[in-house]
A protein has these predicted regions:
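Short beta-strand-to-loop acidic/aromatic patch adjacent to the donor-nucleotide binding site
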Residues: 1-7
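Conserved donor NDP-sugar-binding/catalytic core segment of glycosyltransferases
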Residues: 7, 11-44
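A recurrent flexible, glycine/aromatic-enriched loop bordering the glycosyltransferase active site
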Residues: 61-81, 97
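Short, well-ordered alpha-helical scaffold segment located
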Residues: 84-88, 122
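Acidic donor-binding loop at a coil-to-helix junction in glycosyltransferase catalytic cores
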Residues: 97-104
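Hydrophobic residues within well-ordered alpha-helices
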Residues: 108-109
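Active-site-adjacent helix/loop segment of glycosyltransferases
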Residues: 115, 121-194
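Juxtamembrane C-terminal module of membrane proteins
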Residues: 194-231
Length: 231
């Protein structure tokens, strides 16, 4: 799987993803390293390096205590899946508002398989989201987590978020650009506001949800299905 806004960084992308899957038959999914576009802003550029380091790692159930929510991280911006396992575990959930790749990765991990971050498989992919876009995106992210308490109830993503913020602040100071901490702070406000509202989406009206989401069509389909089911 690869999204239309991602570009292979070299000719070895598919080879490296396939290698990651075939090295160990217990590896159910492998995802690529994401490198920033040339026009990527400094804060987002660092976020890419934080989430997609230059060292590969295989993640399994035994890593949950150490890695927390990142154990289940997998991005189908560019990823490969073992076909037999993909079908055995039911593939991607549908309909889904967000995180379909992460949900599958969690199913694979809990089933005793591994998810491989393959740093040698590289794509160019980044966004310069506005604060409003960050708000909408994190609203949907939190909704998806709330809909899956079996995965996220015992593992908080907020701790990982704070780790990223602190690391980014330290980085900005180290490169002589502490003034960008203000930009980082504004982005964090947008992200956190969207996230907290998403966690409480069941208390919001439909009108409020449509103002917060970046996926209005998902909600319309969901609500229509509820009517059809008589709920």
């Amino acid at each position: 799987f690869m999204t239309q806004d991602a570009l292979p960084a070299d000719k070895s992308l598919i080879e490296n993803l396939v290698k990651a899957l075939t090295e160990d038959e217990k590896t159910g999914a492998a995802y690529a390293r994401q490198l920033p576009n040339e026009n990527c802003r400094i804060v987002e550029r660092y976020t890419r390096s934080f989430n997609y380091p230059d060292e590969s790692r295989k993640k399994g159930k035994a890593d949950i205590e150490e890695m927390g929510i990142k154990t289940f991280f997998c991005s189908d911006v560019c990823a490969a899946y073992r076909v037999d396992l993909f079908h055995k575990l039911g593939g991607f959930e549908s309909p889904v508002i967000f995180n379909e790749d992460m949900f599958f990765a969690a199913k694979a991990v809990f089933a005793g398989y591994y998810v491989k971050y393959e740093a040698e498989a590289k794509v160019i992919h980044s966004h310069n989201y506005t604060v409003r876009q960050q708000f909408h995106r994190n609203f949907d992210l939190a909704v998806s987590q709330t809909m899956h308490p079996e995965i996220f109830e015992q593992i908080s993503s907020e701790a990982e978020g704070m780790k990223l913020v602190k690391s980014t602040m330290k980085y900005l100071c180290s490169i002589g650009k502490p003034y960008l901490i203000f930009e980082l702070g504004i982005q964090c406000v947008g992200k956190y506001a969207g996230y907290r509202l998403g966690k409480r989406y069941k208390k919001l009206s439909r009108k409020q949800i449509l103002k917060c989401t970046m996926s209005p069509e998902y909600w319309k389909r969901l609500w229509n299905q509820e009517v059809s089911d008589g709920n």
